[in-house]
Amino acid sequence: MLGVKGNYLLPADCAHRLVAELQGALDSCADRQRQLERSLRVSRRLLQVWEPARTPSPVPETKEEDPSPACAPSSQDLEELELLTQALEKAVRVRKGVSNAGQRDRTPTLTSKAATSGAAAASHPRAPSRGGSRVLGTRSTKGIQRATAPPKDYPEHRLRSKGDKTHVRTQDQTTGYGPDLRDQQMTPSSAHHTTELFALKEKGTLLQLPEDFRKAVSRNSCLWAQLNSARTNDSTDATRAAKTQFLHKLQMASGCSSHRPSATEVEAHARILRKACMLLRLRMQKELAIAPTDWMQEYRCLLTLEGLQTVVGQCLHRIQVLQAAVTEQLPGECLAETRTQASSVCGGEVDSACSPELLLYASTEELQTLATLKLQVALLHQQIHLEKVLMAELLPLINTQDPGGPPWLALCRAAYSLLCEGGERFLTVLRDDPAD
């Protein structure tokens, strides 16, 4: 015969507290699941085969020449384009006509004045000599310079220095309209230029580092060259000492060596840690002295104590780092005193278990095993917390009930199932009635 099933309802306040705890556990599990899914997506993305982005293949010209019906220009656009082309051609013709007319007006003046000056020079009776020819050439040159002076209608052409020659001034005047003419002759299609694609594989050698980086690279190359030369000639003790000194300088120059604090810095950090430990001790005593009146206050107190424990672990880790730095700097006779000072910062010995340790693994399978075990440990912590809450809520109810009755037995079995079996199994009692 199966055991008697008793119906027992929990008090309202107890049920509300248990439901809140279970809901919090479910929310934390959902957050952990989202974090795992996010890290899983990142890991899958990193494990994929990386391929550089390929440049798009050029489209054949035949396809570009046959535009789609959606991109075909309308008749109004064609008319506006034709009118614009005609206006540009007319402006070019007008500019050419103005420039040609200006050149024709200036050329007869130049030739006529040059001929007049030549005739005036020939009218003077001079003996044919070398000096006379030089004077004639000089006068003719000056006449040409006066003839090529710009008129008042063109203010942009000012008088230049006297050493300028005639052909230079003529060239400046004839080419004055060159840039404007070229700008007018440009077709609208030349404005549409295609951007050239930059491929790192093909044109990566054209890139240049900034000046600071180039200096650092050259200095690093020189240092490594000296290091290789020191490795090849490593026969004597002097060479070994020089190489050791050089490596030390290399580490100091590159900034790769860890910063070792001095004695004053260690003492300053020790004072800060002493003050932090004193504050932590006071806060912990205050939290332990408070008697929680409800489960929410007790839960907040537990969270505060967990936070204080984390801060204490960080302080202990910092103490170990300072102790290692002082051990490397001080001689062996001062190590005992250093350990005593470091251990007395928080009023006790330094426990290596409280300090965070590095996670080391040799393969991906080992890393997967470590992650699985970490999740299992987190799950066990959650179960232990829930069992503690259930114990605090159910045991007082069991003690207040009258023992021996079926409801009390059912309540005991339910408490045992929740506290000892994790709610996975429920005990049943088989009892045979004695025969009459």
UniProtKB/Swiss-Prot annotation:
Q: Subcellular location, in the record's words? A: Cell projection, Cilium; Cytoplasm, Cytoskeleton, Microtubule organizing center, Centrosome, Centriole
Q: Give the residue ranges for region: Disordered.
A: 53-76, 94-191
Task: Output the Gene Ontology cellular-component terms.
Answer: centriole; cilium; cytoplasm
Instruction: Mark out the compositionally biased spans (Low complexity).
Output: 111-131
- Looking at the Swiss-Prot or TrEMBL record, what is one Pfam family this protein matches? DUF4693
Which Gene Ontology terms describe the biological processes this protein takes part in? positive regulation of smoothened signaling pathway
Q: Which domain of life is it from?
A: Eukaryota
Keywords attached to this Swiss-Prot or TrEMBL record, sorted alphabetically, are: Cell projection, Cytoplasm, Cytoskeleton, Phosphoprotein
- Phosphoserine modification sites are S161
* Ranges of compositional bias, category Basic and acidic residues: 153-170
Q: What does this protein do?
A: Acts as a positive regulator of ciliary hedgehog signaling. Required for centriole stability.
The annotated subunit structure for this chain is: Interacts with TEDC1. Found in a complex with TEDC1, TEDC2, TUBE1 and TUBD1.
| Protein name per the record | Tubulin epsilon and delta complex protein 2
Q: Which organism is it from?
A: Mus musculus
Gene assigned in the entry: Tedc2
